Design a protein with these regions (language model features):
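Short, low-complexity interaction segments enriched in Ser/Thr/Pro/Gly
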Residues: 5-6, 41, 81
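Negatively charged, low-complexity tracts enriched in Asp/Glu with abundant Ser/Thr
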Residues: 1-33, 57-61
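Mixed-charge, Lys/Arg-enriched low-complexity segments
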Residues: 53-92
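Intrinsically disordered, low-complexity coil/linker segments enriched for acidic/polar
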Residues: 2, 43, 48, 71-72
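Long, continuous compositionally biased terminal/linker segments
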Residues: 31-63
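Compositionally biased, intrinsically disordered/low-complexity regions enriched for serine, proline
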Residues: 16, 39, 44, 66-67, ...
Length: 92
C-alpha cells in the first residue's frame, strides 16, 4: 500500500481530498475552496509521521505534526477530528 493511502482516506468535514495535486515531497492535498487547503506531507526518515500544513490564501497559517499508523482506524479517526478542530479558525 502507498504510504499515503490511509491519509487520503481522512474524513475531514468540509474538506475534500484532491487527487489532482501532488508535489515532489509526496504530499497529498485537501481543499475547502480555491484559497484554503491542507497539505499533508510524510516526514522523511520517520515512518507514519506527517506534517499537516494549513494554508490560507498564499500563506501557511499553521503547521501540525502527528503520527498516524496506517493500520489503525481509531488513530485515523482521531487525527481527522483533531485536524478538523484545528481547521475551525480558518473556516470563517
Amino acid at each position: 500500500m502507498d504510504s499515503m493511502e490511509h491519509i487520503k482516506k481522512l474524513k475531514i468535514e468540509g474538506w475534500v481530498y484532491n487527487p489532482d495535486v501532488e508535489d515532489k515531497l509526496g504530499s497529498v492535498y485537501f481543499d475547502r475552496d480555491e484559497d484554503n487547503y491542507l497539505r499533508v506531507t510524510p516526514l522523511k526518515n520517520n515512518p507514519n509521521t506527517y506534517i499537516f500544513t494549513i494554508t490560507q490564501g498564499c500563506e501557511d497559517a499553521e503547521i501540525l505534526i502527528s503520527v498516524v499508523p496506517p493500520d489503525d482506524e481509531l488513530a485515523l479517526s482521531n487525527t481527522a477530528l483533531w485536524i478538523k478542530k484545528e481547521l475551525q479558525p480558518y473556516e470563517s
